[in-house]
Amino acid sequence: MAKKSKIAKERKREELVNKYYELRKELKAKGDYEALRKLPRDSSPTRLTRRCKVTGRPRGVLRKFEMSRIAFREHAHKGQIPGVKKSSW
């Protein structure tokens, strides 16, 4: 489990990205890079890290399920993810 402070910080970043999305888009279209530079750093979408929705783990996250590989494996074995089953050949 990730630290709660890290998860909260990431959530705050997501809110900032959403808040400044339209303004950032307009400034990029105009080419006003000076105004872009004055926006908060955390409003840039490149600063976001994909995190597991279950554990908050930042690494090894499967995009489709928004879960870390470890949490995905546990939930899949329990049959809690619809349409996913262990394959064998």
Curated annotation (Swiss-Prot):
Coiled coil: none annotated. It comes from the Bacteria. One of its GO terms (molecular function) is structural constituent of ribosome. GO terms for biological process: translation. Signal peptide: none annotated. InterPro entries: Ribosomal_uS14, Ribosomal_uS14_bac/plastid, Ribosomal_uS14_CS, Ribosomal_uS14_sf. PROSITE patterns: RIBOSOMAL_S14 (PS00527). The keyword rRNA-binding applies. Keywords: Ribonucleoprotein, Ribosomal protein, RNA-binding, rRNA-binding. GO terms for cellular component: cytoplasm; small ribosomal subunit. The keyword Cell inner membrane does not apply. Belongs to the universal ribosomal protein uS14 family. Part of the 30S ribosomal subunit. Contacts proteins S3 and S10. PANTHER family: 30S RIBOSOMAL PROTEIN S14, SMALL RIBOSOMAL SUBUNIT PROTEIN US14M. Binds 16S rRNA, required for the assembly of 30S particles and may also be responsible for determining the conformation of the 16S rRNA at the A site. This is Small ribosomal subunit protein uS14A.
